[in-house]
């Protein structure tokens, strides 16, 4: 068997598939798909909040792995505790000569974490702003956009109709979105929530039990959400129930809903990416990092960023994509898929080179 055919033992960190979110689940699906295409076998996939530093068995598996992948989604900013944990992982891998790659990541407002950035074998960030932040501390990175954008959606031929409004990870923004929907009869609220998948074979025995508990808890919340009314001025305790009340649980149905709508107004990054994937016109509001602004700048859609839901709704008659925007989006998605595939090929090549007899 040639070196290029040897299967690589990979460990994945920050598996977000249990986070009740269509975007997170699609990211993980794409990571497993792209890794498999280049001969990476992800033997263990570490849940988002599992601490590798207290898991002796996992540390042993790290030292025996051919490479480690860190999904930076939602973590590598503001010196967050999870960010520092993955920075320490990169340092640990470096000490034990295990290639460690950061993928699918933002990088913003870090100080302590910057000290560990150079420990990653290579960093692949989602946007040019993150690349610039790393360059400011002397660390090079490559830009590969969010991995949801590498997903190829089969568009339906049905006519688009209806406007969808989605909230934000920021509660104040979500409340603003809900007030806007309640004031208009022509708007439909939709949540990006979904159920945690039931899954086995990811190298952590508690995965199935954990996700089963999460599913049962979520199903109870979904059922309860239908027994509440949701006034325009929504009390904070009802925010979680609102998200479940307007969830579309199937990713396939959710993407088809986007694909049938005339447009979407959202403050969530992954709903922006899924609008791009489904070819759905949208207006976006800023989120908790620069991720939305940076993505829109990359695609050439910076003018689709709006300061408020009210202003976005007032501009809804101009939400349709222009021909030049459609061309830019098509080119961007094609390039993104190529970049994602090239990123995994490069990581596999580096790991194989590091595992040749004269290197290990």
What are these regions (language model features)?
Residues 1-360:
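Active-site anion-handling motifs in enzyme catalytic cores
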